[in-house]
């Protein structure tokens, strides 16, 4: 073990908050257009088998200032940009971003001199009481990983398994749920058994030699520097070695994990076809390192499980025996869990035919209620508690909207939260009175924190902050059931024709609003034209005609914009009264301003 002394910078909260908008003097719209064309060319060349052209195009991305700019912007605009790891350099101003681009140019031009910084390791608690290690690379290492990911992800999409949906562009949980549900509903296959597979520490235990074999294009010196850089735990100065696996927290780690597990679907299929089993039908589905295999008979299931173990052993992995099981779906009324959804077969009302059902597990509902109670017990202002509860509610609602039982569960959760909010407000109000009776406190609570909905007796909780802004409690009942959807054809999100098909599939799981907006604008930011689906960029709905000028909440008055910086730039242009910027956004069709207001702005500027 090596003991090294590190000088940790004491970072104040303000240092994380005051981050400059990304503006390095390069047209980022042009950067993304150039990058998308290069990535499409790489994907097409890979499909045609032209490896020489693939490597040439990938090298152009790595060597280009456009590629470096997109990589730095990806890290700077991500949520993890506030976590420095063991970085000693600052990464919050445009001057820092330009310096990082110069550093990337030096590393890529001479990779043999590159040395990765040790990882900063923290532990995140899991549901079962254990802890998941999260290793955070330095800013330089993250930007370098983002740069090489831009080059190799189009290649990886061409060799990916058809039924792999985790950490892939334009794929999501809906696809995995739809794949399993479609298999269970197949009357010809009549699947009765499921093999639930849980890999033991998948990301942390992959063999480094195997990673080196399956990862294309990245120089071996750089790849091995990432794998062998070691880690330092928080509140410790001891450098621990990394002998296996990739860091959980690295930008390129999910892609490397997918490259490692790709090929498992064909391996299982080949083993079952070569067996003497009379029924060879099976359906495979994988999301990251979680996977299930549906089979018609127990004999086929007993063939599939050893095939998985054999495939994983070559990669230095093994299954967790405690969580790897073979179940009979028909006899087991509880069914099986996959991605926190419960799948089972139930009889229809006529009791003659089995049908498949996707539900929300009771354990997930209990954990959700536990989190809400923990938030409500904190000593924070009511509007802050309200906003935190809304964030949890939205995440839960939009994740589980693919479950058949979502309507019933959301309705009961909404009523439960109404009661929790009432109890919390009642306790806070009761302390302000010495001998007030229940009726008086109840009247004060209902008049202060609840507003009536329509002409009925229903009320909606809301809180007014110190600035007089109302914060209403999100209604989870407003989230409608959305049927899961997927396609089993080989589609590469980086090829335009394929991305159009994938967008149409994803639109089926969107609300009617988003469907209309996507049909009009496509899955791109209205300002920078960045593909939001491929790059998994957080976006917001922007009112083309702002509400202050009479704009309405209708799909035709909405456009998708990157959360940062595009939406901030468009909104701030009105506040700053910048006529040139406003006219530019009007010409792009993402902003409408009344003519008299615009004329007044021009007049006021000319008077100065």
From Swiss-Prot:
Record-listed E.C. numbers: 2.7.7.49
Principal place of residence: plastid
Alphabetical list of SMART domains matching this protein: HNHc (SM00507)
GO molecular function annotation: endonuclease activity; nucleic acid binding; RNA-directed DNA polymerase activity; zinc ion binding
Domain HNH positions: 525-571
Localization (cell): Plastid, Chloroplast
Enzyme class: transferase
Catalytic activity: DNA(n) + a 2'-deoxyribonucleoside 5'-triphosphate = DNA(n+1) + diphosphate
InterPro entries membership: DNA/RNA_pol_sf (IPR043502), GrpII_Intron_Splice-Mob/Def (IPR051083), HNH (IPR002711), HNH_nuc (IPR003615), RT_dom (IPR000477), RVT_N (IPR025960)
Entry's Gene Ontology cellular component terms: chloroplast
Keyword terms of this UniProt record: Chloroplast, Nucleotidyltransferase, Plastid, RNA-directed DNA polymerase, Transferase
Domain Reverse transcriptase: start-end pairs: 105-343
PANTHER family: NUCLEAR INTRON MATURASE 1, MITOCHONDRIAL-RELATED, PROTEIN YKFC
UniProt protein name: Probable reverse transcriptase
């Amino acid at each position: 073990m090596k003991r090294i002394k590190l000088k940790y910078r004491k970072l104040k909260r303000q240092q994380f908050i005051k981050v400059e908008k990304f503006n390095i003097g390069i047209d980022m719209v042009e950067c993304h257009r150039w990058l998308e064309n290069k990535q499409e060319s790489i994907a097409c060349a890979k499909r045609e088998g032209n490896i020489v052209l693939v490597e040439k195009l990938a090298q152009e991305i790595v060597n280009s200032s456009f590629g470096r700019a997109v990589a730095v912007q990806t890290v700077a605009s991500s949520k993890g940009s506030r976590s420095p790891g063991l970085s000693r350099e600052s990464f919050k101003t445009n001057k820092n971003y330009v310096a990082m681009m110069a550093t990337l140019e030096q590393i890529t031009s001479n990779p043999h001199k590159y040395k990765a910084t040790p990882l900063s390791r923290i532990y995140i608690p899991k549901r079962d009481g254990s802890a998941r290690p999260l290793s955070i690379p330095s800013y330089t290492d993250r930007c370098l990983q983002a740069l090489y990911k831009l080059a190799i992800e189009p290649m990886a999409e061409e060799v990916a398994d058809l039924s792999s949906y985790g950490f892939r562009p334009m794929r999501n949980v809906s696809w995995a749920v739809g794949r399993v549900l479609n298999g269970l509903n197949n009357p010809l296959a009549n699947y009765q058994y499921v093999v639930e597979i849980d890999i033991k520490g998948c990301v942390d235990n992959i063999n480094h030699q195997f990673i080196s074999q399956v990862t294309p294009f990245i120089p071996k010196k750089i790849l091995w520097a990432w794998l062998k850089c070691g880690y330092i735990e928080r509140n410790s100065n001891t450098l621990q070695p990394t002998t296996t696996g990739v860091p959980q927290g690295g930008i390129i780690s999910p892609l490397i994990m997918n490259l490692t597990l790709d090929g498992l679907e064909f391996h299982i299929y080949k083993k079952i076809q070569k067996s003497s089993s009379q029924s060879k039908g099976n359906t495979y589905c994988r999301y990251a390192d979680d996977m299930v295999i549906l089979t018609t008979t127990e004999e086929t299931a007993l063939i599939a499980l050893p095939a998985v173990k054999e495939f994983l052993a070559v990669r230095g992995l093994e299954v967790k025996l405690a969580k790897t099981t073979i179940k009979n779906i028909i006899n087991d009324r509880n069914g099986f869990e996959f991605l926190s959804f419960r799948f089972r077969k139930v009889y229809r009302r006529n009791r003659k035919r089995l049908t498949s059902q996707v539900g929300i597990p009771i354990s997930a509902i209990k954990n959700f209620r536990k989190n809400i109670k923990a938030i409500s017990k904190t000593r924070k202002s009511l509007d802050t508690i309200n906003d935190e509860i809304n964030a949890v509610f939205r995440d839960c609602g939009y994740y589980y909207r693919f479950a058949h039982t979502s309507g019933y569960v959301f309705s009961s959760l909404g009523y439960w939260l109404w009661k929790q909010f009432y109890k919390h407000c009642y306790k806070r109000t009761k302390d302000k009175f010495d001998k007030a009776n229940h009726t008086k406190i109840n009247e004060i609570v209902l008049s202060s924190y609840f507003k009536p909905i329509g002409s009925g007796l229903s009320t909606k909780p809301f809180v007014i902050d110190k600035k007089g802004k109302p914060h209403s409690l999100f209604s989870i009942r407003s989230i409608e059931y959305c049927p899961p959807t997927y396609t089993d054809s080989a589609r590469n999100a980086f090829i335009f024709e394929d991305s159009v098909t994938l967008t149409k599939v994803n639109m089926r799981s969107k609300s009617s609003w988003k469907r209309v907006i996507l049909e009009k604008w496509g899955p791109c930011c209205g300002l920078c034209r960045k593909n939001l689906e491929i790059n998994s960029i957080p976006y917001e709905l922007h009112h083309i005609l702002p509400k202050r000028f009479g704009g309405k909440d209708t799909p035709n008055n909405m456009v998708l914009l990157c959360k940062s910086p595009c939406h901030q730039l468009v909104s701030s242009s009105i506040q700053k009264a910048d006529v040139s910027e406003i006219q530019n956004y009007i010409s792009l069709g993402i902003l409408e301003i009344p003519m008299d207001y615009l004329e007044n702005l021009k007049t006021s500027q000319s008077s100065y």
